[in-house]
A protein has these predicted regions:
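Secondary-structure transition motif
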Residues: 1-216
Length: 216
């Protein structure tokens, strides 16, 4: 078990974080909201300095030659190698290795040993949803381009041509009616640490402004 708070993120959002484009996340204040806990946080962090461990869609392959598990991520990037003997919970990885040869496993089922990304909460505030600014929407990882609206990051609503319009479209799809303007918790975060396999890629962020991820 991890002492940290689990947060499940889509492949697109993981890539946005690793590329330095996503540094905020908003969730409805109501703890019984159907998507807040089931599809994002397992429990809501409440203090600055709280640490989140990110779960994402993944596969596990067993390397019989090296007696290692290889964790492959839907967001792309290098696989994480985990020694079958030294891992704390080899049973969970073995189960996933047996069941995930062809299909991606949902992020909610990722064991802690497979995690490659940890975040630290740097600020928390409560505000109305529609208090979000254009800069905030950009910090949520939104992008837009001039093409028909598509319900997937990097662009959700490109016809209006703004990060805020993209975020509004994203909210409508994930949480429901934007016009209800609910209170939300706003979390600012930074990357605290990553797996050793990811460290070389993060070093390229300042040089390239983006990480050359490919999605399988």
């Amino acid at each position: 078990m991890s002492p940290y708070t689990q947060v499940a993120l889509s492949a697109s959002m993981v890539k946005a974080i690793l590329n330095g484009h996503k540094t905020q996340i908003r969730v409805p204040c109501a703890t019984d909201h159907k998507d807040t806990l089931n599809n994002c946080f397992k429990s809501l962090p409440s203090h600055q300095g709280n640490i989140l461990w990110v779960t994402e869609d993944f596969k596990v392959i067993f390397d019989y030659k090296c007696n290692d598990y290889l964790v492959i991520y839907r967001a792309g990037g290098p696989a994480k190698r985990i020694n079958a003997i030294n891992t704390d919970n080899p049973g969970s990885l073995f189960k996933h290795a047996h069941n995930s040869s062809t299909k991606w496993i949902n992020s909610n089922h990722m064991p802690y040993a497979a995690c490659r990304l940890w975040l630290e909460i740097t600020d928390i505030r409560i505000e109305q949803l529609q208090d979000i600014t254009e800069d905030d929407a950009r910090a949520e990882g939104m992008h837009w381009t001039y093409q028909p609206a598509v319900f997937s990051i990097p662009q959700y609503d490109s016809e209006k041509g703004s990060y805020l319009a993209s975020y509004q479209s994203f909210w409508n799809k994930k949480y429901g009616n934007w016009d209800l303007n609910p209170k939300v918790r706003v979390y600012h975060f930074r990357i605290l640490r990553v797996s050793s396999e990811l460290e070389p890629l993060l070093q390229k962020v300042n040089e390239l402004k983006t990480i050359p991820f490919t999605t399988n």
